[in-house]
Amino acid sequence: MIVVATDAPLDARGLKRLAARAIYALARTGSTYSNGSGDFAIAFSTHTTNRVTAAPGAQQRIVLPTDSVSGLFEAALDATEEAVYNSLLQATDTTSNRQTVRAIPIDELKALLKKYGR
């Protein structure tokens, strides 16, 4: 599960698009997708005009124009990609009753990322 938080004034449509970009970041890290993989993302905004209030009548809302969200999309991609790598690099060797899965060798990962321009 990926959670994307922003203080940008996005409406439901913009937040849905932002969450989708976070999923794209998994592909950057080599993730594969299949039926039942369970990969999903949600996004929310903390912008003050998105808050529900008890004030009577219609509330004015500020929404970032569609043509102004590319920077947010890139930021969601970059932050998600970094979070995946941070998680992988904090892993330790894990042993079950059948096998041991070794932690990723950080130096080898750095070399691979450099080789492929990441």
Where are these regions (language model features)?
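A structural signal for small-residue-enriched, beta-sheet-centric alpha/beta enzyme cores
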Residues: 1-118
